[in-house]
Amino acid sequence: MRYDLSVEEGLVDFIENKALPDTGVSQDNFWLGLSSLIKEMTPENRKLLRAREELQDKIDKWHVARIGQPHDHEAYKSYLREIGYLVDEGESFLIETENVDPEISSIAGPQLVVPSTNARYALNAANARWGSLYDSLYGTDAMGAFDQAEGYDRGRGARVVARARVFLDNAFPIIGASHADVKRYYVSDKQLLVDDLPLVSPEKFIGYSGNPKAPNSVLLKNNGLFVVLVFDRAHVVGSRDQAGLADVRIESALSAIIDLEDSVACVDGEDKVNAYSTWLGLMKGDLTSEFEKNGKKVVRCLNSDLSFISPSGDDFSIRARALLWIRNVGHLMTTPAVLDSNGDEIFEGLLDAMVTTMLGMHDLKKA
């Protein structure tokens, strides 16, 4: 027992010995908080579910009473207003939320959804912030159907490189030249020069790594999204490129939802611990996954931030991981992992809200 709650032993062990340490939250405060939350919000949750059930019952009866009749849109809309399903639009207002992550407030990009019960999928999603344009073009039908030849197809690879240069010409045009003909990228007088020529929009050059005269990488930005040119003349691609360009990496999945709801089936405390463990590892930054690929052991972990030097010579870093969201279970489901003072299953969403917020404190304390 934890206060007036009956909690599955595995969940207790996870909360007290793995999750709470280093958060600054004591075991007593956590369980007291969960107990208080359940007492306060369970009646509200049930009230909402009753209201939903009543509305659904009225809507069902409307349709049953009109079986075989043509649909009357205006009458149906009027009925939905009458029962309170539809309400009048309110006055316009300004959102006052501050300190919102740019991935939410100002940058547009893809978002992934992955099950919280699969650490490998979660790592893939978190690391999907960056992707190789070369790999994406080569490995899909964007460049046409694959030939049957085994191994690296040089012809296809050449078409990929040419297509990537078209992208660079469109996003980062050079005054009087094309990226397809470039032999050298370097930094001089706080700007990127490409065969001694500047970009049409020099402000799109954000930074570089390595030697400014022969950088390892160049960081560019277009429409709010970063692009990294990777140079490596020892690389299989870079060795055949006159500028030594081995890859073009682009910002891809800006955010990812770690899902506790639709894509998982968590039926007891053991399942919840599995799901919460993934979120804990993501928040602490130490999540790993081991698997075999082509007969070799692979250990996957979270990517580290990317470091660069600004045009003015200052060191800075940018995010290498997607902004992570957590999707808790909604209002309907209950879980046997925790029973209230009456011996009833608690609403799973209340448990999720308490636990995932507490786990998120590991990340907040690192900031």
Language-model regions, residue ranges each:
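N-terminal-proximal low-complexity accessory segments that begin disordered
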Residues: 1-87, 95
